[in-house]
Amino acid sequence: MKFLSLFFLALAGVAFAHDGGMGGMDMIKSYSILGAMIGLGIAAFGGAIGMGNAAAATITGTARNPGVGGKLLTTMFVAMAMIEAQVIYTLVFAIIAIYSNPFLS
């Protein structure tokens, strides 16, 4: 965890390195991109954990009672779609924050 924190802090320094001629609009663009990347990374990480837990629970339920495997599989696919939808919503929000930022106009 300490390595990841140090890595992101070092990455932010490289991302915002400039020669002093950067205006306010460029700084807003940089922060928008950094915020979008961090938000999308957190959403993808949380979605992956949720999908793993859903798959593990479905496999455990099917192993305990093979007769309801079909119903559990259907429920798992619905849960996977809902989890993935949250990640896609975050991606759409990140794209909107980057390309049509209201603070840049």
From Swiss-Prot:
<keyword id="KW-1133">Transmembrane helix</keyword>
<keyword id="KW-0472">Membrane</keyword>
<dbReference type="GO" id="GO:0005886">
    <property type="term" value="C:plasma membrane"/>
</dbReference>
<dbReference type="GO" id="GO:0046933">
    <property type="term" value="F:proton-transporting ATP synthase activity, rotational mechanism"/>
</dbReference>
<keyword id="KW-0138">CF(0)</keyword>
<comment type="subunit">
    <text>F-type ATPases have 2 components, F(1) - the catalytic core - and F(0) - the membrane proton channel. F(1) has five subunits: alpha(3), beta(3), gamma(1), delta(1), epsilon(1). F(0) has three main subunits: a(1), b(2) and c(10-14). The alpha and beta chains form an alternating ring which encloses part of the gamma chain. F(1) is attached to F(0) by a central stalk formed by the gamma and epsilon chains, while a peripheral stalk is formed by the delta and b chains.</text>
</comment>
<keyword id="KW-0375">Hydrogen ion transport</keyword>
<keyword id="KW-1003">Cell membrane</keyword>
<dbReference type="Pfam" id="PF00137">
    <property type="entry name" value="ATP-synt_C"/>
</dbReference>
<dbReference type="InterPro" id="IPR002379">
    <property type="entry name" value="ATPase_proteolipid_c-like_dom"/>
</dbReference>
<protein>
    <recommendedName>
        <fullName>ATP synthase subunit c</fullName>
    </recommendedName>
</protein>
<dbReference type="InterPro" id="IPR035921">
    <property type="entry name" value="F/V-ATP_Csub_sf"/>
</dbReference>
<dbReference type="GO" id="GO:0045259">
    <property type="term" value="C:proton-transporting ATP synthase complex"/>
</dbReference>
<dbReference type="GO" id="GO:0033177">
    <property type="term" value="C:proton-transporting two-sector ATPase complex, proton-transporting domain"/>
</dbReference>
<dbReference type="GO" id="GO:0008289">
    <property type="term" value="F:lipid binding"/>
</dbReference>
<comment type="function">
    <text>F(1)F(0) ATP synthase produces ATP from ADP in the presence of a proton or sodium gradient. F-type ATPases consist of two structural domains, F(1) containing the extramembraneous catalytic core and F(0) containing the membrane proton channel, linked together by a central stalk and a peripheral stalk. During catalysis, ATP synthesis in the catalytic domain of F(1) is coupled via a rotary mechanism of the central stalk subunits to proton translocation.</text>
</comment>
<feature type="transmembrane region" description="Helical">
    <location>
        <begin position="32"/>
        <end position="52"/>
    </location>
</feature>
<keyword id="KW-0812">Transmembrane</keyword>
<keyword id="KW-0997">Cell inner membrane</keyword>
<dbReference type="InterPro" id="IPR020537">
    <property type="entry name" value="ATP_synth_F0_csu_DDCD_BS"/>
</dbReference>
<comment type="function">
    <text>Key component of the F(0) channel; it plays a direct role in translocation across the membrane. A homomeric c-ring of between 10-14 subunits forms the central stalk rotor element with the F(1) delta and epsilon subunits.</text>
</comment>
<dbReference type="InterPro" id="IPR038662">
    <property type="entry name" value="ATP_synth_F0_csu_sf"/>
</dbReference>
<comment type="similarity">
    <text>Belongs to the ATPase C chain family.</text>
</comment>
<keyword id="KW-0406">Ion transport</keyword>
<feature type="transmembrane region" description="Helical">
    <location>
        <begin position="78"/>
        <end position="98"/>
    </location>
</feature>
<feature type="transmembrane region" description="Helical">
    <location>
        <begin position="3"/>
        <end position="23"/>
    </location>
</feature>
<keyword id="KW-0446">Lipid-binding</keyword>
<keyword id="KW-0066">ATP synthesis</keyword>
<keyword id="KW-0813">Transport</keyword>
<dbReference type="InterPro" id="IPR000454">
    <property type="entry name" value="ATP_synth_F0_csu"/>
</dbReference>
<feature type="site" description="Reversibly protonated during proton transport">
    <location>
        <position position="84"/>
    </location>
</feature>
